Amino acid sequence: LKTDSRKVQSGDAFIALAGARTPAEHYMDQAISAGATAILLESEQERQCHERHGALIVPVVGLRARLGRIADRFFEHPSRHLRVIGVTGTNGKTSVTQYISQLLRETGTPCGLLGTLGYGMPGSIESATHTTPDVVQVNRVLNRIRNEGGRAAVMEVSSHALDQGRVDNLTMTGAVFTNLTRDHLDYHGSMEAYGEAKARLFLREELHFSVINFDDPFGRQLYGQLEGQCDRVRYSLHEAQTELWLKEFTPTASGFRARVDGQWGEFDLAVPLLGSFNASNVLAALATVLTLGVPVERAVSIVRELSPPPGRLERFTGSTGKHVVVDYAHTPDALANALEALRPHIRGRLICVFGCGGDRDPGKRPEMAKEAEKRADYVIVTDDNPRTEQPCSCASCPPVSSGT
C-alpha cells in the first residue's frame, strides 16, 4: 500500500490524493505505469469502480479522512501490539524520543523509533522524509517494528502531523509534551492554533498516561485540561510538588550531576549530556519509562550511558583541544537554550554560527539574532538551506540587522 507514486512497484495498491496543485488522477496514472494493480482514488462524489489500463480504480469520497482506518486495517493493527509513545513539543522531541528508546532498550524492551533521524529498529533505520510520515507509512513502519521483535515504539509527533491526520487511528499508550514556543506560524497562523494542534495528541480516548513539562505555561494549561482524561505525570526543573523534579543540578566538563525527587523517591543521576535543558529532556524520558514500570535503580544506571542524538549539542574536539558543538536549534527559544546550556561548560569565548531556512517563517529571524547577540561573544550569520530565496536574503542580513 503506497501513497507516493514514485515508490510504486508491480502489484502494489496506490492511494491517489490530490496535491496542492496537482489532481489525484495525475498520480494515479504514474502509479499505473509503475505497475499498480489497484488504485484508491480521492473523489468528490460517489462513482462506480472501473478498470484503467488493467488496474482496478476505486473512487472513495473523503479518502483523506479515512486513511487512518484504511492503513490500520491493511497492516493488521500494528499499534495495538506495541506500546506506542508519542512525543510532541516545539523543541526536544528528537532528544526525548532517543532517550526513551535507549532507556527502554537497555532495560529489556526492544523499541523502535519514528522521527527526524529515521524510522525503524536500531540496526535497520531508514532515512526520514518527515518528522512524522504519513499515516500509511507510520503503520508500515510500526508493522515492521513488530515483525522485527519490537515491543514498543517511540515517535515524534509534529503539529503538522496532528493537523493532517498522520497519527489517526493509532493506539497510543502514552504521550509526552516538552514545550510550546514560536514556530510554524507560517502554517498554523497563530500560537493558539499551534497549541490546539499539539493538544490533540493528549485528547485521545485510548491514552493511558501523559507526561507534561510543568515549567511550560502551555504545559500547565494542558495539565488542567486533561483532568479526568488519563493519568497525568508532571516533570519540572523547579516545582517541588510535581511527580518528578530536579532538586540539584551541577554542570561538569562532560555533562552534569543531578539529584531528582518525586513520587519514585529521591535519587542521584550522572548524565553525560550538556545543558540544563537536557536535564528537562532526561526528566521527560525518565518520567515516561518509570510510568511504564521500569525500576528506578535500573533506569538510573542506564542514564549514565545516554548519548545525544546527532546534531543535538553534539561535541567534537580537534587536535588543538578546541571544542565545536553542533546543534539543530532552529527557533529563537532553542538557540537561546543551546547557548545558555554551553556557558557553564566552557572557559573561553563562545562563538555562534547560525542561519535560518529559506521560505519559512521570516518573523523568527530577527528574534534568533537577538538571542545570539545576547548570549554569544561573537556571532556569524550565514544561510541554512535557502530553498528558493537568495542566499543573502536567506541569511536575513537586513532582518537580522534590525533584530540586533
Identify the role of each PLM range.
Residues 1-69, 217, 245-248, 274, ...:
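N-terminal leader/targeting and accessory segments in enzymes
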Residues 13, 38, 56, 174, ...:
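Well-ordered beta-strand positions
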Residues 19-22, 308-311, 333-336, 340-403:
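Active-site beta-alpha connecting loops in nucleotide-dependent enzymes
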Residues 28, 101, 142, 198, ...:
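Generic hydrophobic/aromatic pocket-lining and core-packing "Φ" positions
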Residues 43-46, 116-117, 159, 180, ...:
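Short, ordered loop/turn segments at secondary-structure junctions
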Residues 45-50, 148, 163, 172-324, ...:
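Acidic, Mg2+-coordinating active-site environments of NTP-dependent enzymes
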